[in-house]
């Protein structure tokens, strides 16, 4: 069997090997398919490969990582450079205009904006100094604690479980509208009885998994249950995927009043610390990579 090579392009600061990403348990399955996988970052020496995946855990991919991706002949997610919610949300609310009813406030950034907050700290001169002294994580923890003491509406990052809903736009704190890190959307939640629901579509090439989470909270974090969905993802969602240029990722959405509402898109989906809980999804998705190795 001809050995083929696949490069996962990360950002050095992502510490890929220390995190729990859905892509990681696929690597041994690809090895069985004759595909060797290497991990590369913008700080490493160039490693040649037949194809690559742009797997940078930031909302907006830095230029250095884009330059690395340009050196490969085929790049999965190569066009997915900016996944701020303002780039895809159809539910955005402005401060003026017709009353939208209940609203929901969250960050424009992916995963609450924590990665961007960390990057801003570590790229500052105190951050570079503390990194040289091996104290960078200490500095980040101190800054995060100080940030959490700020008024909620003025923060640069927010735990996703702390996103807030308001009965009307008039109740949204004035500071929210001045904070470029936050967005206000119409509160469009899929419901089943008293539970809030979120559907998850994860895919790699033509392979996919579809499920739905039920939760007691609108942020859908304290899970009541996760169940597979037999029905395929809606065609409308597939068109969004095509428009955004995703080859691999996860979309969170709901069906509200018969209409699709896209909540979030993610090009670096994670896993729980127990990889066995995702074994079925990994086995289903991994063969999708073969489309880039004809």
Q: Where are the language model's segments positioned?
A:
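Conserved N-proximal alpha/beta basic substrate-recognition cap immediately N-terminal to
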Residues: 2-128
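Active-site flanking residues adjacent to catalytic metal/cofactor-binding acidic residues
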Residues: 105-107, 251, 263
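Protein kinase-like catalytic core scaffold
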Residues: 103, 182, 209, 261-263
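C-terminal active-site "lid" helix and adjoining low-complexity regulatory extension at the edge
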Residues: 227-228, 243-248, 255-294
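Generic beta-strand structural signal
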Residues: 98, 203-204, 255
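Short catalytic/ligand-binding loop motif for oxyanion handling, primarily in non-cytosolic enzymes
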Residues: 17, 61-63, 85-86, 111-115, ...
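Phosphate-binding site of ATP-dependent enzymes
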Residues: 134-240
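Short, flexible loop/turn elements at secondary-structure junctions
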Residues: 109, 188, 267-269
């Amino acid at each position: 069997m001809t050995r083929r090579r696949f490069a996962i392009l990360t950002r050095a600061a992502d510490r890929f090997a220390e995190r729990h990403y859905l892509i990681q348990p696929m690597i041994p399955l690809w090895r069985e398919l004759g595909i060797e996988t290497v991990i590369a970052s913008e700080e490493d020496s160039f490693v040649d490969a037949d194809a690559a995946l742009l797997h940078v855990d930031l909302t907006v991919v830095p230029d250095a990582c884009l330059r690395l991706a340009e050196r490969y002949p085929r790049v999965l997610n190569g066009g997915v450079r900016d996944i701020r919610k303002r780039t895809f949300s159809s539910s955005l609310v402005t401060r003026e205009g017709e009353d939208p009813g209940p609203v929901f406030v969250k960050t424009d950034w992916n995963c609450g904006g924590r990665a961007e907050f960390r990057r801003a700290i570590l790229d500052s001169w105190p951050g570079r100094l503390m990194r040289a002294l091996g104290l960078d994580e200490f500095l980040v923890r101190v800054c995060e604690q100080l940030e959490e003491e700020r008024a909620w509406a003025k923060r640069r990052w927010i735990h996703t479980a702390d996103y807030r809903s308001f009965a009307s736009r008039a109740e949204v704190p004035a500071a929210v509208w001045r904070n470029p890190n936050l967005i206000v959307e119409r509160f469009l939640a899929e419901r089943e009885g008293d539970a809030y629901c979120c559907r998850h579509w994860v895919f790699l090439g033509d392979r996919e998994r579809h499920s739905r989470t039920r939760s007691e909270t609108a942020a859908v974090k304290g899970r009541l249950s996760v169940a597979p969905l037999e029905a395929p993802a809606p065609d409308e969602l597939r068109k969004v995927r095509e428009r955004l240029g995703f080859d691999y990722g996860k979309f969170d959405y709901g069906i509200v009043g018969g209409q699709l509402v896209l909540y979030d898109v993610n090009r670096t989906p994670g896993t729980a610390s127990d990889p066995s809980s995702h074994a079925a999804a990994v086995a289903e998705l991994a063969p999708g990579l073969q489309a880039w190795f004809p």
